Amino acid sequence: MFRGRVRHVHFVGIGGVGMSGLAEILRSLEFEVSGSDLKESSTTRRLTSLGVRIDIGHRAENVRGVDVVVYSSAIRPENPELTEARALGTPVIGRAEMLAELMRVKYGVAIAGSHGKTTTTSLVATVLRAAGLDPTVVVGGKMAALGTNARLGAGDLLVAEADESDGSFLRLTPTIAVVTNIDPEHLDHYGTHERIKDAFVEFAARVPFYGLAVLCLDHPHVQDLLPRIPRRHVTYGVSPQSDYSARGIQFRGLETSFNAYRRGEPLGGFTVKMPGAHNVLNCLATIAVADELEVPLDVTKQALATFGGVARRFTVVGSIGGVTMIDDYGHHPAEIRATIDAARRAFPGEDHRVVVAFQPHRHTRTRDLFDEFTRAFNQADVLLVTDIYAAGEPPIPGVTAERLVQSIREHGHHDARFIADKTDLPEALEKIARPGDVVIALGAGDVNACVRGLKARLEAKSPPQEGSS
């Protein structure tokens, strides 16, 4: 790799989920690792426990004496640490370039797509670990089985989530490339949907002549790309035209089962402890990757059946007084619809209402997908919307959460409410929730605190359980 010339790696924005994973991998490889972030978090505390020096706040002196500086897509070019590093002549690289360097010396499996990539990456990693292949894993969420989002493995494989948000995933050179779906997203970078599709074509084309692209046929924008993919590829989906397909899908509470087929050949029944039709697709992508890597079918089945999930992906926070509370990272209209649909399937019947607390993520996304957001919550009985989580972006005139709620009402939703202060959400939810309700916190910011706050409120007023002290 680059050992010898580089001994000390510094991460600007180390608390981010993608950055922290790379930092943990490099620390496991015995590099000296340091980093900075604007605030302390459970992630920074974990890294500190691993021997990573972390400074709170971005200051020029933080990068003096380091060999390379890695920055995330959230860091602005004028950041004082980047400015100082460039002045010192220290190499400054993006996160994707560092991930690409790790992948260069491995057999890379990269999972990209507008949605589902974190879960699919985690599923693939789980199956390959169960097969004894001991992959290195870098994923955009905390895997329950690992207790973290990254792990250095002894095997030749590297399984990574590929972030398409700024186009930097085109630096990766995977041997297997998965594309889960393509939606209008990150238009602040790409400008048009067609340019997004072009980027995914280039991503799939980066696999070598002996590699494989795994593509979701059910998604029309992915299907559009098939004639343009110059490499060997297979498709997956519920469609019978898919190379890897599913039939007989059944939803039983938080569990989903289906029968899988490979070009019409039955592969048997599969079960996963996650609700939602979208997770069937994530499993099919995993089955296709495992098949390419010659993982025995029974190993794949068992690994999927015991998969423990990923943090903030339909995570059940608790169930008190008949109220089930769920934390989900969904922040794009397609993800929102899929999560609400999964809740409807997991908790069917008239006795169950779906109550959603939503925090829009980024002003640009709210602006670019405003019309789609107005129709994304039709299946929610009650909707609470709080202010936009800026993620470092400046406000955009006329783009507000309050205006979004107004538009949602204008488009036919009968119970959409604006809660300006997110700290008021737990109290508002407590007043709304009744036995049988499913309360979902939706968003990529910090809205998940509201369901934990609701849980604390319900616990405080619920009668003590027998045998408790």
UniProtKB/Swiss-Prot annotation:
InterPro entries: Mur-like_cat_sf, Mur_ligase_C, Mur_ligase_C_dom_sf, Mur_ligase_cen, Mur_ligase_N, MurCDEF_pg_biosynth, UDP-N-AcMur_Ala_ligase_MurC. ATP binds at residues 113-119. GO terms for cellular component: cytoplasm. Its EC number is 6.3.2.8. It is an enzyme of class 6 (ligase). The keyword tRNA processing does not apply. GO terms for biological process: cell division; cell wall organization; peptidoglycan biosynthetic process; regulation of cell shape. Its main location: cytoplasm. It catalyses: UDP-N-acetyl-alpha-D-muramate + L-alanine + ATP = UDP-N-acetyl-alpha-D-muramoyl-L-alanine + ADP + phosphate + H(+). One of its GO terms (molecular function) is UDP-N-acetylmuramate-L-alanine ligase activity. Pathway: Cell wall biogenesis; peptidoglycan biosynthesis. Keywords: ATP-binding, Cell cycle, Cell division, Cell shape, Cell wall biogenesis/degradation, Cytoplasm, Ligase, Nucleotide-binding, Peptidoglycan synthesis. It holds the Pfam family Mur_ligase_C. It is found in: Cytoplasm. Belongs to the MurCDEF family. Cell wall formation. This is UDP-N-acetylmuramate--L-alanine ligase. It comes from Sorangium cellulosum (strain So ce56). The lineage of its organism: Bacteria, Pseudomonadati, Myxococcota, Polyangia, Polyangiales.
